[in-house]
A protein has these predicted regions:
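Non-catalytic N-terminal targeting/anchoring module and adjacent flexible stem/linker
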Residues: 1, 22-24
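Bacterial N-terminal signal peptides that target proteins for export
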Residues: 1-9
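Bacterial N-terminal signal peptides
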Residues: 9-19
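Beta-rich carbohydrate-recognition and catalytic domains
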Residues: 24-65, 73-122, 130-239, 243-287, ...
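Structural signature of WD-repeat beta-propeller blades
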Residues: 70, 125, 240, 290, ...
Length: 393
């Protein structure tokens, strides 16, 4: 039997009452006819001139052949991209975090360099970024080799110039203890100055929303009041992403490990202190990591593989004016001849457009992902052009 665990502060009763009310909040949804599930290449969507795709890294015979967990950010006019890489297999002992840079808005990229390598005790995966005016912080998810059940902890590295990096240090909770979990890759800064995120805590991988008021995100994290559904070694809900509605409501969307192939959603009305119990939406999913956020006009977007099956193509962006009704869809990458063949075999190298993460920069929506878990690519949506063909407000 699945059990529900409650992770709360001393105001447990108030949190339960609050979450009961939140359960009545409308979940995000799409119209039944928005996507054509019978068209496996495009879901019935057409290509758009507002969309362009660029290669960040393409493997060669002599290079690493596995890539995933691609995350971008912008710092001091330069685009930065991190991802995990290994010789050929997912989460192999040599898995390290590499980084590449672009000075021309993502058209061309530098050769990747290792910023956090594996050692005899653990391997590393990408944990995302937080930027301030003066510093760029990279989060490094660190996985001890023999920990059972599988889990890990989070470290950070800092640069002020994009070249010289500090040594890795533990990310810390509000009480000074190291974060005993794997941070999700896209922390969400709110207008209040609070950063909302999520982490998969030990033992195993059990998700919880977290928040901090520290602009760099290096310490001060607290676990929110939240209900997850326990599947022993991990929670049912995994790998969330966050957007905000115009009234300030926060929405966290999850991958559902119970294989409904629909996204789950949880809602917070108090700036991330308490969250409703996650519920299944009608938004199709490939049981995969996704990316959500807000455009400059306040509308919400969601990027992923809304196939309703394990298939990780096409790559699609969904848009909503109010953060409830997602009524527009944009084809980012199609399947078929538009999906390049996988060239190098390896463990868990899933075909398709894997684990997208996104950011808005200079009125463009950047989506970074790993194609066939070997090519590192980014798709860029010009938001001015998008307005002409796809109303979002």
């Amino acid at each position: 039997m699945k059990r529900a665990h409650h992770i709360c502060t001393l105001t447990l009763l108030l949190a339960i009452l609050s979450s009961t009310g939140l359960a009545q909040e409308q979940l995000p949804y799409i119209d039944d006819g928005l996507l054509d599930s019978t068209n496996i290449e495009t879901l019935g969507l057409k290509p758009s001139p507002a969309v362009k795709t660029f290669t960040i890294f393409s493997p060669k015979d002599e290079s690493m052949h596995y890539a995933n967990g691609v995350v971008m950010t912008a710092f001091k006019g330069v685009l930065f991209c991190m991802w995990q890489c290994s010789l050929k297999d997912e989460d192999a002992p040599e898995t390290s975090v590499v980084m590449s840079k672009s000075t021309d808005e993502g058209h061309t990229w530098s050769q990747p360099i290792v910023i956090a390598g594996a050692n005899d005790n653990s391997y590393c995966t990408s944990g995302g970024w937080i930027t301030t005016t003066d510093t760029l912080t990279a989060f490094i998810n660190t996985w001890p080799n023999h920990l059972e059940p599988t889990g890990g902890f989070t470290r950070y590295m800092v640069t002020t110039d994009g070249c010289k990096w500090s040594n890795p240090e533990p990310v810390r909770m509000y009480n000074g203890q190291p974060m005993n979990g794997i941070i999700e890759q896209d922390p969400y800064p709110t207008a209040s100055g609070r950063i909302i995120g999520a982490a998969h805590f030990q033992p195993g991988l059990h998700i919880s929303p977290i928040y901090t008021h520290i602009p760099t995100g290096r310490y001060g994290w607290k676990r929110a009041c939240f209900t997850f559904h326990d599947r022993n070694k991990q929670s049912r809900e995994l790998e969330p992403s966050i957007y905000q509605r115009r009234d300030g409501t926060l929405v966290m969307l999850f991958r559902d490990q119970s294989s409904t192939f629909r996204k789950m959603a949880s809602i917070s009305k108090d700036n991330g202190n308490t969250w409703s119990e996650p519920a299944v939406t009608n938004i199709p999913d490939a049981r995969v990591k996704q990316s959500a956020g807000n455009l400059p006009d306040g509308s919400a977007y969601l990027v992923g593989n809304p196939t309703g099956a394990k298939r990780r193509w096409p790559l699609v962006a969904l848009f909503s004016c109010d953060g409830i009704h997602f009524d527009h869809a944009l084809l980012l990458r199609a399947g078929g001849k538009n999906l390049q063949p996988q060239r190098y075999p390896g463990k868990a190298k899933t075909l398709g457009y894997n684990y997208p993460k996104s950011m808005v920069h200079n009125n463009k929506l950047y989506i970074a992902y790993a194609t066939n878990k070997e090519d590192v690519e980014c798709t860029v949506v010009d938001l001015e052009e998008l307005k002409q063909i796809l109303p979002t407000n």
